[in-house]
Every structure is written in C-alpha cells, then in structure tokens.
Curated annotation (Swiss-Prot):
<dbReference type="GO" id="GO:0003690">
    <property type="term" value="F:double-stranded DNA binding"/>
</dbReference>
<keyword id="KW-0963">Cytoplasm</keyword>
<dbReference type="GO" id="GO:0005737">
    <property type="term" value="C:cytoplasm"/>
</dbReference>
<comment type="similarity">
    <text>Belongs to the YejK family.</text>
</comment>
<dbReference type="GO" id="GO:0003727">
    <property type="term" value="F:single-stranded RNA binding"/>
</dbReference>
<dbReference type="Pfam" id="PF04245">
    <property type="entry name" value="NA37"/>
</dbReference>
<dbReference type="InterPro" id="IPR007358">
    <property type="entry name" value="Nucleoid_associated_NdpA"/>
</dbReference>
<dbReference type="GO" id="GO:0043590">
    <property type="term" value="C:bacterial nucleoid"/>
</dbReference>
<protein>
    <recommendedName>
        <fullName>Nucleoid-associated protein Ent638_2782</fullName>
    </recommendedName>
</protein>
Length: 335
C-alpha cells in the first residue's frame, strides 16, 4: 500500500461529567514512524471499505477557511489541528450524547491523491499476554468500529472546487445526530447522493432491458453482468463508469446504455460510487418486517417462488432442508 504521511496530529477530548469535555492538546506533531504509518494504512483501508455519504463545504465553513490558509502556508498544521479540535469540542458540547475520544488529523497521499482525514477514535481497554504468559491491561484505538470519520480529497477540492463529492463522511451507527454535529463542525452539507445514483442505475437498467424486449433469462443475465462489473469496481475502490458499463452491455440493444440513460433523462453522473446494499437488488430479493425476513435469488422468482400482487401472497415451492426440518418438528409436536 503506497500511503505517505505528510503531517499527522493527535489530540484528546475527555468527558469529565455530563456538562464538561476537557481538551488535551499535543504541543507537537506525531512523527510518521512505521507504527504510525501502519495505523494510518489500517484506518485508510477500513474507511475506504465502508459505504460513505458525499458532501461539500458551505461558503461559511470555518474549517474550510482554516484549511485553505494552512494549505497556502499561512498557518502550520499543528495550529490548524489544535484550533479545529477546540471547535469540535464546542460543537460536541451542544449534544447530550457527547463522548470523548482521540481526535486525529492526518494529511497523507495515496496513489497520487492528497487527503485530509479527520476522525474521533475510541481508546478502549483490553487484556494482553506477554512472553512470560502474564496477563496485563492495555489500551488500543478502536479503528474497526470508527463511525465519526470524514475525509477531504484535497486534490479534488483544490482542482475542482465546484465538485459535490470531494468530502466524504460516515453517517454513524447511533443515529442521525452523530452526523449532524460532525457536519456542523466541518461546515459542510451533503452533495452527491450515491444511493440515489445507484437506484437510478437499477431503474434505468430495468427500463433498458424492457425496451430491448429481452426475455426473463436474458434480463437476468444482463443484471448479473452489471452486478459483476459494479462489484469489481467496488472491490478495486473504483467508481461505476457509465461509459465503461455501457461497453459491457454492447449488443443488448441497438442503442447504447449510455445513450439510453441520457435520452430518457435519468440524470446519472458520468461516474459515481457503487452502493453495495442497493446493487444487491440486481441479483437478490430481500425484505423484512412484522417478524418475517425473506431473502432469495432473483432467478427463483417465477420458478420456485411466485408472487400474487392481487393478494400480496408469496408462494414458495420447495423449502430449504434445515427450514423444512424445523417446520416438521414444530408441526408434529416435537421441539
């Protein structure tokens, strides 16, 4: 992994009581040692693998103004990170759920792209066994479960300031308010809606195959082809490219998929990030509610699984052996 740290700073927020968040600021930057670089490589890997929301700075963003000055050499990175951590503390203090944590700012380069990553990491306790097989306590940064993270593509921001996608962030696992306070701190608003783009792609694909008058098997083959392409892009950390996807679908219709989406007004970007959960709908049907969870391969619809829209009834012919065994035990009075 070609990740080069330019500058990295750590600070800390300590929750003393319900109303107090204490600020602990470092007086110097971290040295980019092999351990620090390994930690950042892991953080980059974990963050890159997650579904992210996309955004852009508001005109009045204090963070953007300070970052611009820092990039122009008018403010050093340590001073920038210290001031930003103070603003983060002030923003967090407005919320009753506010917790402390390790605040990390890192400017780094990965594959010719410069990034600024900002995150609040939990510092957790655990146990370790040493070479003498003695047990002692230790602390570690919970990188795998980080949910307060934002990353600015500095290269994109500086070369294409009108972009709506140079800033990415996680919405958090504990509710909308987590991303609210972080967006307020960043002075940012949501931009490109990747999930909406993926849903638009699926709708366009359904309409495209319908207009091409493909039969059921052909339609499913096209969906599988698109799913394979999108999955490969996702695994490679690349975006869905409408032009390259259109080439994948050459021969399906006299009109290319790219021309079809443009003519029909689907408003798809030339490229956009893949959304894993949305793309699963290409090959799977899934849903849950009212104590019922259903998940099956799309190819089974009309073969072993039938839906009657008039009565909203799903009929399954041939149940999985483990499910059938449970049903037989329960209906026969067994346990």
């Amino acid at each position: 992994m070609s990740l080069d740290i330019n500058q990295i700073a750590l600070h800390q927020l300590i929750k003393r009581d319900e109303q107090t968040l204490e600020l602990v600021l470092r007086d110097s930057l971290l040295e980019p040692t092999s351990t620090v670089t390994e930690m950042m490589a892991e953080l980059h890997r974990v963050y890159s693998a997650k579904n992210k929301a996309y955004g852009m700075f508001n005109e009045e963003s204090e963070l953007a103004q300070s970052l611009r000055l820092q990039r122009q050499g008018e403010e050093d990175f340590l001073a920038f990170s210290r001031a930003a951590t103070g603003r983060l503390r002030d923003e967090l203090a407005k919320y009753p759920f506010a917790d402390g944590g390790i605040v990390l700012f890192c400017q780094y380069r990965y594959l010719a792209v410069e990034y600024l990553l900002v995150t609040v990491l939990n510092n957790l306790s655990s146990m370790r066994v040493n070479e003498q097989l003695d047990i002692s306590s230790t602390h570690y940064l919970d990188i795998n479960h980080a949910d307060i993270v934002a990353r600015i593509d500095l290269t994109e921001w500086e070369t294409n300031p009108e972009s709506t996608r140079y800033l990415t962030f996680l919405k958090g696992r504990v509710g909308r308010k987590v991303s609210d306070f972080f967006m307020d701190f960043l002075g940012a608003s949501e931009g490109l809606n990747a999930k909406a783009q993926n849903k638009g792609l699926l709708q366009a694909l359904d309409d495209f195959t319908a207009e091409a008058q493909l039969d059921k098997s052909e339609r499913q083959n096209v969906r599988q082809q698109v799913y394979s392409y999108c999955s490969e892009q996702l695994q490679a950390g690349e975006e869905i490219e409408l032009e390259s996807l259109s080439k994948e679908l050459a021969g399906v219709s006299e009109v290319s998929f790219q021309e079809f989406t443009a003519d029909k007004g689907y408003e798809l970007e030339e490229s956009f990030p893949a959304d894993r959960s949305t793309l699963r709908q290409l090959t799977k049907f899934a849903g849950s509610g009212g104590g019922l969870t259903v998940n099956f391969d799309a190819m089974l619809l009309g073969e072993r699984i039938f839906w009657d829209p008039a009565t909203d009834t799903l009929t399954i012919k041939g149940t999985p052996p483990n499910l059938r065994d449970q049903l037989q035990r329960r209906t026969s009075g067994g346990k």
